[in-house]
Amino acid sequence: MSKIRVLSVDDSALMRQIMTEIINSHSDMEMVATAPDPLVARDLIKKFNPDVLTLDVEMPRMDGLDFLEKLMRLRPMPVVMVSSLTGKGSEVTLRALELGAIDFVTKPQLGIREGMLAYSEMIAEKVRTAARARIAAHKPMAAPATLKAGPLLSSEKLIAIGASTGGTEAIRHVLQPLPLSSPAVIITQHMPPGFTRSFAERLNKLCQISVKEAEDGERVLPGHAYIAPGDKHMELARSGANYQIKIHDGPPVNRHRPSVDVLFHSVAKHAGRNAVGVILTGMGNDGAAGMLAMYQAGAWTIAQNEASCVVFGMPREAINMGGVSEVVDLSQVSQQMLAKISAGQAIRI
């Protein structure tokens, strides 16, 4: 089997050296070239035809976003962004994902060499995932038209969504058409701390419903979406007749915190047939067992189809476990969620 060919673009010679060490330490990949800026990278891409590009967000001569935008228009390829953990860095990274980057890794703020080498396995996994990603499915998407929701039967209805690689754009596409009369939406997207708040704020500006980073103990309200904070698990809980959010530091599940399985299992327990579950693009199997639990509890469950996924991992696993009611294209997910929950069809007979 041929190795994954990687090209790294970073203005820091140290970062280029570290990325080369990391990539070449894995037997299934190799660093074919490195570039100090996008202009040099342009020529190296033509020369080496890499499978995956790692790209620093902030560089001289041409910044990473400008280069990414041109690259995705002229020569689409899998890109993993390398970002700082600053507030500005998180906003720029989210814009990069919108432009078509597959995923991102964050630079440690102190001890770059030790920090990056500690991330070695995670970086390699993101490169592997990017190499398998469906680039055609990751073209920037126009804002969908607002849908109309039928009358909610009760405030007990809610929607739970889980996603990973490619999920930030998929979630935007699902939330943007939702009207103010939508039921509550609770979302777990695999994302490190420092990024989920920026992600929620970005969505809040784009959506009619209110979108925020979830807080422990807050009441779950219709017309609102709640994003699990990075490096924290989020669960649905009950407080009398109301739903409540529970945030905690439990151990990683399926190597993830937040974990989609943790969210879905809690929704199965506390909402059951009053819920609709949605599993979107992502690598691995997180959420598959939780979706099966939701299905067995009477929830209607939706998986994104392979053609519209960046990575058809999590949806495939959920389908294979037998916990999916229907498989639909990303463009139809919002409509199906509202149709099932508004008509009371979250209850399966």
UniProtKB/Swiss-Prot annotation:
Record GO terms (molecular function): phosphorelay response regulator activity; protein-glutamate methylesterase activity; protein-glutamine glutaminase activity
Any single biological process term in GO = chemotaxis
The segment(s) forming the Response regulatory domain are 5-122
* E.C. numbers: 3.1.1.61, 3.5.1.44
One GO CC term of this entry? cytoplasm
* Catalytic reactions of this protein: [protein]-L-glutamate 5-O-methyl ester + H2O = L-glutamyl-[protein] + methanol + H(+); L-glutaminyl-[protein] + H2O = L-glutamyl-[protein] + NH4(+)
The entry's active site is: S164, H190, D286
What are the alphabetically sorted keywords of the record?
Answer: Chemotaxis, Cytoplasm, Hydrolase, Phosphoprotein
Check the record and name the InterPro entries matching this protein.
CheB-like (IPR008248), CheB_C (IPR035909), CheY-like_superfamily (IPR011006), Sig_transdc_resp-reg_Me-estase (IPR000673), Sig_transdc_resp-reg_receiver (IPR001789)
Keyword Cell membrane applies: no
Q: Which family, according to the similarity comment? A: Belongs to the CheB family.
The protein's name is Protein-glutamate methylesterase/protein-glutamine glutaminase
Question: What is the organism field in this record?
Answer: Salmonella choleraesuis (strain SC-B67)
Q: Lineage in the entry? A: Bacteria, Pseudomonadati, Pseudomonadota, Gammaproteobacteria, Enterobacterales
